[in-house]
């Protein structure tokens, strides 16, 4: 699911308003992608207050065109990374190129698609470059 909300730290009310507007509901097992508009000079990210929402909706993967962080929690460096990876077991895809995906989604009027990714095998690695594919 692509949520296209550039230029803001996205909070629960933003996602719920987006769901009402698009008719799309983020559900268990979804891969959730946020386009912040980084590549066109805008910025934003997931606000840490969304962490309970991620748990409630039981998402499987979280991605964005930025390193995810749209706000801070006192005493916690990179709260989205810490809480989603460690506490929820959610996979993270940072710094994705989402402009073409957003353009296609807008043209089709569709925000849901099949997502696949093929990472490079890195023995004992904790992260790797990958080839993401969205099929509408």
Regions found by a protein language model. Name each.
Residues 1-136:
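Active-/binding-site microenvironments in catalytic and ligand-binding cores
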């Amino acid at each position: 699911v692509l949520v296209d909300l550039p230029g803001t730290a996205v909070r629960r009310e933003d996602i719920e308003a987006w769901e009402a507007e698009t008719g799309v509901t983020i559900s268990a097992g979804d891969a959730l992608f946020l386009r912040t508009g980084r590549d066109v000079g805008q910025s934003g990210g997931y606000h840490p207050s969304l962490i309970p929402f991620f748990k409630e909706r039981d998402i499987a993967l979280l991605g964005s065109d930025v390193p995810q962080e749209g706000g801070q929690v006192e005493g916690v460096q990179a709260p989205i990374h810490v809480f989603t990876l460690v506490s929820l077991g959610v996979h993270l895809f940072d710094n994705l190129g989402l402009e073409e995906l957003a353009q296609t989604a807008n043209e089709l009027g569709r925000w849901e698609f099949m997502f696949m990714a093929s990472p490079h095998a890195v023995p004992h690695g904790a992260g790797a470059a990958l080839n993401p594919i969205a099929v509408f």
